[in-house]
């Protein structure tokens, strides 16, 4: 399911994630722990939800984005016709650093929240088979 929680307070986010977890009790919740994600990870843990924190660094981001690209190339990922997700995927870009590593991000002034959410979902799901996101 694709559920954006833009400008949503932590308690509401925890409540909505708890409701999703009750519908899908075998799911794995993965949340970025960086900056603003730290308090939500803590709130999810305090609520007793099974959350795995993910620390986003250039290297960890490169790993999950490379995996996402491969999943799309193989046809293992199917996404809803969500204009925000599709727009973010189309705008997302990679730049080669002087070190040779890739740095991935949204262009200046844009967001990559749904791209990162999809990449995180795929990174934990890929060993279990295809990923299908549905609009509900």
Annotated model-derived regions:
Residues 1-55, 62, 66, 76-136:
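RNase H-like, metal-dependent nuclease domains and their acidic two-metal-ion catalytic environment used
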């Amino acid at each position: 399911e694709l559920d954006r929680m833009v400008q949503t307070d932590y308690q509401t986010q925890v409540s909505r994630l708890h409701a999703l977890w009750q519908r899908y009790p075998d799911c794995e919740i993965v949340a970025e722990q960086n900056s603003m994600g730290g308090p939500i990870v803590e709130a999810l843990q305090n609520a007793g939800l099974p959350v795995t924190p993910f620390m986003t660094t250039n290297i960890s981001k490169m790993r999950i984005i490379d995996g996402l690209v491969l999943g799309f190339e193989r046809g293992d990922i199917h996404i809803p016709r969500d204009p925000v997700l599709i727009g973010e995927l189309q705008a997302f870009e990679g730049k080669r650093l002087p070190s040779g590593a890739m740095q991935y991000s949204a262009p200046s002034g844009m967001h990559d929240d749904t791209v990162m959410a999809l990449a995180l979902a795929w990174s934990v799901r890929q060993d279990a088979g295809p990923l299908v996101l549905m609009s509900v």
